[in-house]
A protein has these predicted regions:
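His/Asp/Glu-enriched, well-ordered alpha-helical/loop segment
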Residues: 11-95, 109-113
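Active-site microenvironment of metallo-dependent hydrolases
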Residues: 65-154
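Helical hairpin unit composed of two closely spaced alpha helices linked by a short loop
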Residues: 3-4
Length: 154
């Protein structure tokens, strides 16, 4: 959307039997890399394009961001099941966007942002706990230094 390069036709892709998945586009054309945000953008843009509130429902979009994406790349993940990779996010339900508890999936797709993610577990390893990544100070310092070098070249 930022580059105004067109709008994806969700319904046509479904009719054609295309497996729909979600991903982030990369920082060069989509300054953020949040799958939570991408779920909302995918759901709302599909509804706007089709002029139908029943297109790209929350459960479908959540699946596009999880199990469908993993399956498309042949990764044994995307759902919690015996024999699958132990990948999970722990969500902080005490965030304002998560208060309405009629549908956790709906809240994640339409109301949440990445700040609701408390803990990230990938292949059984805790990568982020209580919103802290080991070594994040050094990672941020390196990022700031790299950004400063890029700005200096302009």
């Amino acid at each position: 959307m930022k580059l105004c390069s067109g709008q994806f036709d969700h319904e046509a892709a479904q009719r054609a039997g295309i497996r729909l998945t979600l991903g982030t586009d990369g920082a060069s054309s989509n300054n953020g890399l949040s799958m939570v945000t991408e779920m909302k953008v995918a759901a709302l843009s599909a509804k706007i394009r089709s002029l139908s509130p029943t297109v790209a429902r929350d459960q479908e979009v959540f699946g596009m961001a999880t199990a469908a994406g993993a399956a498309a790349f042949g990764i044994d993940a995307g759902e919690i099941a015996v024999g699958r990779l132990a990948d999970a996010l722990l969500i902080d339900l005490d965030q304002p966007s998560m208060v309405a508890d009629h549908s956790l999936v709906s809240n994640l797709v339409y109301a949440a942002d990445s700040s609701v993610i408390n803990t990230v577990i990938c292949d059984g390893r805790v990568l982020m706990r209580d919103r802290y990544v080991d070594g994040q100070e050094e990672i941020l310092a390196q990022g700031r230094a790299a950004a400063a070098r890029v700005r200096a070249r302009r």
